[in-house]
Amino acid sequence: MVRSVFALVFAAVLLGGCASVPSSSAPQAIGTVERPAPSNLPKPIPGMDPDVLLREFLKATADPANRHLAARQFLTQSASNAWDDAGSALLIDHVVFVETRGAERVSATMRADILGSLSDMGVFETAEGELPDPGPIELVKTSGGWRIDRLPNGVFLDWQQFQSTYKRNTLYFADPTGKTVVPDPRYVAVSDHDQLATELVSKLLAGPRPEMAHSVRNLLAPPLRLRGPVTRADGGKSGIGKGYGGARIDLEKLSTTDSHSRQLLAAQIIWTLARADIRGPYVINADGAPLDDRFAEGWTTSDVAATDPGVADGAGAGLHALVGGSLVALDGQRITTVEGAFGRMGDQTGAALSRTGRLVASVVTLRRGAPDVAASLWIGELGAEAVQAADGHNLSRPSWSLDDAVWVVVDTNNVLRAIQEPASGQPARIPVDSTAVSSRFPGAITDLQLSRDGTRAAMVIDGRVILSSVEQTQAGQFALTYPRRLGFGLGTSVVSLSWRTGDDIVVTRNDVGHPVSYVNLDGVNSDAPARGLQIPLFAIAANPSTVYVAGPQGVMMYSASSAEGQQSWAEVPGLMVTGAAPVLPG
């Protein structure tokens, strides 16, 4: 049941971009902003049965404004004074109240399924399991009807009301290299479109979610702040970001002076607003002057296109594949063995092009399945020679970061980076600290892929999808931190994975009915079409437009632009060869 609920939610995310699902609240933390309550929230009415009143109270907690004022209408004054609504909210469904009734007082205990949590920053994460007993709830009869007189601290939020009240939006922060922006999805309970821009910029100023604080850069960090609410480009207060009205953002206390940093600052704002359907031009001022004199009349997404989070890496490189253990390029319906080492070497079992499409990392595995199996990692330019960068009994499929380092897992639990030394030209092997991952999820890492911005790593551990942040320490070393599980509905069926976008992972599974599924950063999973696929699927590669999988009949593809009536996988001409595996930048 949980999987079907999440599947419906995630389908809405894919189709709508800004789906009618979870989203956060106020410009600072949830509940601190004063604004009118959404019109769809219930209110207590005389004659309301205690069970109904409790359920309506859970719905009213969906509005965090004014310290959950809408929900406090269901409480006595003493209960409202005592109730601590700070911190994260638990999202619950299938709620059952077990009541002991008296003429003037009702005592109730609550049972429910946990579907997720919503932090005070608006960060939603899926979860599963039964709600531990939160403690008794007491109701008393008053002159205005039944009211809650005692309740546990914390917020329990009705799942259905959550979906109808909150909207998913994405904040963007800069990656450490300054080449692109990184998604940070949030859930926002703002029904007035003209308030949304102020809400989102305020959240940018408040910073990234805690687990990304050391993985991204925020060019809008303090002391920078908003001088006032976001308006239309001409200063008007209605129609913000609609039509040609644009948006005007007035900042103050700017400390960023160099042009590139100001460009990144603008990119964070522009992509955050543009992805929320708040259209430009974007007039961005700082301390009473244009952020950049070149764009005094307003910025557009074209002005920050170099950081576009939706662009496919190395798109010009095209699709490659491993066929018969060697790397080939697909030219129309013909395959051509690439020149150089990667075309000559046999026994290649996993490969990836660099983010630019100019370099290749490939794993060669000898004596597969034998006790003395041996694997080695080779790195080089596409069409040229290669150097050995690592070895072991087995190596995971390689993955490239934005700084042209190759990440690989050696012998199922040793994560390392291989990067070319500028002086010698030889690759250096640098261990990655994965203690946080192995401590919480101690199984074998059978696949590891970096997100396109390089700030997150998705792994397959014991058939589950595990996400972690990528942090660089002050000493220059790298670590995988804050691991958490995604896609509880996938069980332990996951075989391999690939990042489709910075917010969306696609996985292959050993599930006959659902061999390919999606899961996003929130942990919400949904199933891709299965028609036309045969299992087992042993490899996957994806970009924003197309997903490629390797199965018994060869390489199959599914396009995001497929018509709704054509929900089936298509053969990739030239790659319908047993054992062929797709290779893309990533």
Swiss-Prot record:
The keyword Cell membrane applies. It is a lipid-anchor. A lipid is attached at residue 18 (N-palmitoyl cysteine). Its main location: membrane. A lipid is attached at residue 18 (S-diacylglycerol cysteine). It is found in: Cell membrane. Belongs to the LpqB lipoprotein family. It comes from the Bacteria. InterPro entries: GerMN, Lipoprotein_LpqB, Lipoprotein_LpqB_C. Residues 1-17 form the signal peptide. SMART domains: Germane. This is Lipoprotein LpqB. Keywords: Cell membrane, Lipoprotein, Membrane, Palmitate, Signal. Coiled coil: none annotated. PROSITE patterns: PROKAR_LIPOPROTEIN. GO terms for cellular component: plasma membrane. The keyword Cell membrane applies. Residues 26-45 are annotated as: Disordered.
